[in-house]
């Protein structure tokens, strides 16, 4: 789902988040209960390796897009309120963009979470699928979500949200037949790093203003290998 683009410098991303350039897409852990312990001189039980592994594991959120299409988000363990809001925006964008593709452009909800140049970028991405009579099926996975930088404060605050995207479980389809095309694109094989510059909209909510990505063998994208 991605073409060959170059990730711009961080300063440019942050400045774009605070003021109004090329889009490319292509989603707290529960601790196990313990038995009550008397509050006398007992030493608190030490967590088992299994408990530690569970507490370190990301929480998965599965978002249904359409029959046979979904976005899975691996949430960080304890995001603050702003990080949570930004992740929700990026999740809604990915799910919404795929929903626009499978609905043949009828669903335009993805445009609710973008502004400035990101509007044209997102519209062009969806339009390319429609023009070529292409659709998708499968699962896109978003992981290693991280706010890598912030600038400004209050209503003027901007931020860069990085996310690793794995679409290897997706297939590009011929929308007229519903069957996978013979030549599958690179994004169905290798993960890539997506960066979204975000800023506060007039209603106080976060919006995506700029997209950039890094694809393998770029050093930044290597962090998405696992």
Language-model features: locations:
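Bacterial signal peptide processing site
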Residues: 17-22
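Sec-dependent bacterial lipoprotein signal peptides
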Residues: 1-16
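Post-signal-peptide N-terminal segment of Sec-exported extracytoplasmic proteins
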Residues: 41-65, 75
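Structured, amphipathic secondary-structure segments that form assembly/contact surfaces
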Residues: 105-223
């Amino acid at each position: 789902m991605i073409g060959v683009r170059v990730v711009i410098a961080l300063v440019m991303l942050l400045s774009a988040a605070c003021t109004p350039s090329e889009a490319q897409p292509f989603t707290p852990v529960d601790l196990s209960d313990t038995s009550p312990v008397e509050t006398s001189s007992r030493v608190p039980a030490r967590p088992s390796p299994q408990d530690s592994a569970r507490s370190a594991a990301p929480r998965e959120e599965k978002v249904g897009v359409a029959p046979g299409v979904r976005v899975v988000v691996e949430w960080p363990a304890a995001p603050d309120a702003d990080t949570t809001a930004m992740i929700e925006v990026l999740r809604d964008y990915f799910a919404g963009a795929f929903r626009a593709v499978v609905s043949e452009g009828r669903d335009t909800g993805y445009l609710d979470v973008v502004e400035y140049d990101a509007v044209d970028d997102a519209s062009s991405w969806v339009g390319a699928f429609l023009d070529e009579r292409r659709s998708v099926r499968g699962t896109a996975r978003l992981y290693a979500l991280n706010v890598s930088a912030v600038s400004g404060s209050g209503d003027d605050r901007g931020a860069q949200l990085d996310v690793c995207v794995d679409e290897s479980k997706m297939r590009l389809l011929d929308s007229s037949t519903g069957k996978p095309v013979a030549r599958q694109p690179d994004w169905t094989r290798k993960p890539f790093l997506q960066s979204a510059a975000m800023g506060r909209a007039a209603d106080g909510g976060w919006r995506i203003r700029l997209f950039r990505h890094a694809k393998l063998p770029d050093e930044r994208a290597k962090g998405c290998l696992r």
